[in-house]
């Protein structure tokens, strides 16, 4: 009987897969000390980021049932 693969919970909270198999994540630097950051910078930080293809392979090992 084969063992089940475990999902890394920290990765599950940080990353999500799109329908096409790309990986989305929330950008950093938008929690505190926001007064010195420009409106344009904060607006761009609200957008989700996409990982590059070689990082996607690593995330898929952390999230086997992703």
From Swiss-Prot:
Which stretch is the leader sequence? none
The cross-references to Pfam families, in alphabetical order and at most eight, read: Ribosomal_L35p
- Example of a GO cellular component annotation carried by this entry: cytosolic large ribosomal subunit
- This protein's source sits in the domain of life called Bacteria
Q: Which GO terms describe its molecular function?
A: structural constituent of ribosome
Keyword terms, alphabetized: Ribonucleoprotein, Ribosomal protein
GO BP terms: namely: translation
The record, for InterPro entries, names:
Ribosomal_bL35, Ribosomal_bL35-like, Ribosomal_bL35_CS, Ribosomal_bL35_sf
Coiled coil region boundaries: none
- Please state which protein family the record places this protein in: Belongs to the bacterial ribosomal protein bL35 family.
Q: Would you tell me the protein name for this molecule? A: Large ribosomal subunit protein bL35
Its lineage opens with: Bacteria, Pseudomonadati, Spirochaetota, Spirochaetia, Spirochaetales
């Amino acid at each position: 009987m084969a063992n089940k693969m475990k999902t890394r919970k920290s990765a599950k909270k940080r990353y999500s897969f799109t329908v096409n198999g790309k990986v989305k994540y929330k950008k950093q630097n938008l929690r505190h000390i926001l007064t010195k950051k420009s409106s344009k910078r904060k607006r761009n930080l609200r957008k989700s980021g996409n990982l590059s293809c070689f990082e996607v392979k690593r995330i898929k090992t952390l999230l086997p049932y992703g």
